[in-house]
From Swiss-Prot:
Protein name (record): DNA-directed RNA polymerase subunit omega
Assembly information from the UniProt record: The RNAP catalytic core consists of 2 alpha, 1 beta, 1 beta' and 1 omega subunit. When a sigma factor is associated with the core the holoenzyme is formed, which can initiate transcription.
Record's catalysed reaction(s): RNA(n) + a ribonucleoside 5'-triphosphate = RNA(n+1) + diphosphate
Function: Promotes RNA polymerase assembly. Latches the N- and C-terminal regions of the beta' subunit thereby facilitating its interaction with the beta and alpha subunits.
Pfam families: RNA_pol_Rpb6
GO biological process, one term: DNA-templated transcription
């Protein structure tokens, strides 16, 4: 079982959303994609943003997301910033 759970991660990610606004993530799939993308960044040499007892990039990515060290942005927002 994943700790924190998908539901816990979704609550953390959506915690800054104002009432009436669209949630940042609506599904577990979004969490999986975001953590996988961050894990690939770590594998490619990005520095972890949190201290972790784990050496696995995916575990580090999950922990970063849970501690709000990384934010999930939509592809539309990402393209606007480029």
């Amino acid at each position: 079982m994943l700790h924190p759970s998908y539901n816990d991660l979704m609550q953390v990610v959506n915690s800054e959303v104002e009432p009436g606004e669209q949630p940042v993530v609506n599904s577990r799939y979004s969490i999986v994609l975001a953590t996988a993308k961050r894990a690939r960044q770590i594998i490619d040499g990005a520095e972890p943003l949190t201290e972790s007892s784990c050496n696995k990039p995916l575990s580090i990515a999950v922990e970063e997301l849970y501690k709000s060290k990384v934010k999930i942005v939509s592809e539309d927002d990402e393209n606007e910033n480029e």
